[in-house]
Amino acid sequence: MGSCSPQLPLICLSDQTLKPGSSKWVKVRSDVRKALEDYGCFEAKIDQVSMELQGSVLKAMQELFALPTEAKQRNVCPKPFAGYFSHNGLSESFGIKDANILEKAHEFTQQLWPEGNKSIKMIQLYAEKLAELDMMVRRLILESYGIEYFIDEHLNSTYYRMRLMKYIARPDNDITAAVGANVDNGANDNADGDANVNDDGASIGVKVNVDVGDDVNDNDSVNIGVGVDINVETNVNGHLDAEANGDATAWVVGAVSGNASVGAKEANVDAELGLPSHTDKSLSGIIYQHQIDGLEVKTKEGKWIRVKPAPNTVIFIAGDALCALMNGRIPSPYHRVRVTEKKKTRYAAALFSNPKEGYIIDSPKELVDEKHPRAFKPFDFVDLFNFYHTEAGRRAPSTLQAFCGVSAGK
């Protein structure tokens, strides 16, 4: 089975001889381009982050999440859903803008520990190393398309946001689903929805634990697939009890049969979702899973690849902004988190690069030709982000295409 299971490309970025202009650099540059054109992401073997630093980051995260609730709630941010969130004791997360910059990390520390705390230095150093890795990969990408002149402008037009996440082990009798498209820019907010489904007079209680991502606005509607093996398709309107989410509504789509079991394979997959299928809106993201897996990436053929954590590996994933910048040459892949571990706490960290406000994303002329006609109109990332908050943006099969696609007719 293992040999038949699809896997993401694994690219070694840890070789000390990997320097611009070297033969190794040229080979890796080609591998990165092919992996991103084929999958929109790849696994990276790295040595920029030592095992010792990884262990220190985990301890720092555990220390963060062990703080009293009132202390954690001091992690606030003017940007909606970009600070700390926790609901129902199932998941919680912190957000740190410019986590790679020491001064900004200190500001985050002051929110939680006014007296100071040295452990945050480990997180800042970790973010700094991941940022260096991200910039190297984006440099490789631009070089591979022959637009070296654009590298400095591109790298200087972005900033980073880090997300630290903790998924608490679920009870065996919970059916877990999630909502939250853009993990690239913020927290996962957890909410409850309880619903009863009647089938020939039988009442079946369904509890749904929902992770709501940072980009959910008031009055938003979101679709959640819940696979309960009951053979009768039904729509259940479940209210999201989320303080930060206003009166957003989750539509729970279930399938129920007389035995009310969760035996179907598809039902089990839906029931284990910790974050549903989505594309990121960022330029890029680097994701680290500590020991417990969960991330799955969808291929062009519609197959799901489950990414198993391995020592000294991270996942580089392209977002919608990078897809637009590269004129569609690099896709932003659909991915999800499916939590199958029932008795273990899952920790994960992600660093996302985003265009700065006011910077216009426009494909370089070298990427537009007869074979690759212009696919997207120029846009400000903030406008894309705001469009994503609208009903039209939420309902669109592709937010990017609906917002600025040449075929969108805007």
UniProtKB/Swiss-Prot annotation:
Its cofactor is Fe(2+). Binds 1 Fe(2+) ion per subunit. The keyword Metal-binding applies. Residues 258-355 form the Fe2OG dioxygenase domain. 2-oxoglutarate-dependent dioxygenase involved in glucosinolates biosynthesis. Catalyzes the conversion of methylsulfinylalkyl glucosinolates to hydroxyalkyl glucosinolates. The lineage of its organism: Eukaryota, Viridiplantae, Streptophyta, Embryophyta, Tracheophyta. It holds the Pfam family DIOX_N. 2-oxoglutarate binds at residue 346. This is 2-oxoglutarate-dependent dioxygenase AOP3. One of its GO terms (molecular function) is metal ion binding. Fe cation binds at residues 278, 280, 335.
